[in-house]
Design a protein with these regions (language model features):
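Active-site mouth loops of central-metabolism enzymes
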Residues: 1-12, 33-39
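Short, acidic/polar
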Residues: 5-22, 43-46, 70-75
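Core alpha-helical elements of the protein kinase catalytic domain
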Residues: 16, 25-28, 49, 58
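Active-site groove signature of glycoside hydrolases
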Residues: 19-40
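Beta/alpha (TIM)-barrel catalytic core signal, keyed to glycine-rich beta->alpha loops juxtaposed to Asp/Glu
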Residues: 35-170
Length: 170
């Protein structure tokens, strides 16, 4: 909470604080969650690489980075001889997929990176709980978030998923 941005000082301080809170010696997978326009990417890449070199982190991951910035991170890591990310975490699901499949998936395949999506169930919408465009009317903590997907196109996807499930006795 006290750490903002991805400067070298912030990255190391946040990792050390996480290790202390966890009571652990090493973090298995450490994410850069958002690109930081105020810090040169080379500084961020070097900082994450140093965490791996120093044994505080086993692997690096990036989340919410554009394909161009992921490619730039990889190039910088190779140039510096530091650890490359092994995971990309995009917002990806059946409702939000075209830009990911067009650009990020080919990059991940080419560079042998894993994809670990967030909002895989479209904030709960793809569970099938919401069957109309008034999803926000549900009195649940997640209903408002799921409501953005409760469109005619979204409901068509739910209907298709239900038909597939029914065909398989699910």
């Amino acid at each position: 909470p006290d750490f903002r941005g991805l400067s070298a000082t912030t990255v190391r301080g946040a990792a050390e604080a996480s290790l202390q809170r966890l009571g652990a010696d090493t973090i298995d997978l450490y994410y850069a969650h958002f690109d930081d326009a105020d810090t040169p990417l080379e500084e961020t890449v070097q900082a994450f690489g140093a965490l791996v070199t120093d044994g505080l982190v086993r692997h690096v991951a990036v989340s919410n980075y554009t394909p161009a910035r992921v490619a730039e991170w990889l190039r910088i890591a190779d140039d510096l001889g530091v650890a490359r990310p092994v995971v990309i975490q995009p917002h990806y699901n059946l409702m939000h997929r075209s830009e990911i499949e067009a650009d990020l998936v080919p990059l991940a395949e080419r560079e042998n990176l894993s994809l670990v999506p967030y909002f895989a169930l479209a904030k709960g919408f793809l569970t099938g709980k919401y069957r109309s465009t008034d999803a926000a009317a549900h009195d649940t903590p997640r209903a408002a978030a799921a409501a953005e997907y409760a469109t005619d196109a979204g409901l068509a996807i739910i209907d298709t998923l239900a038909r597939i499930g029914d065909a398989h006795g699910a």
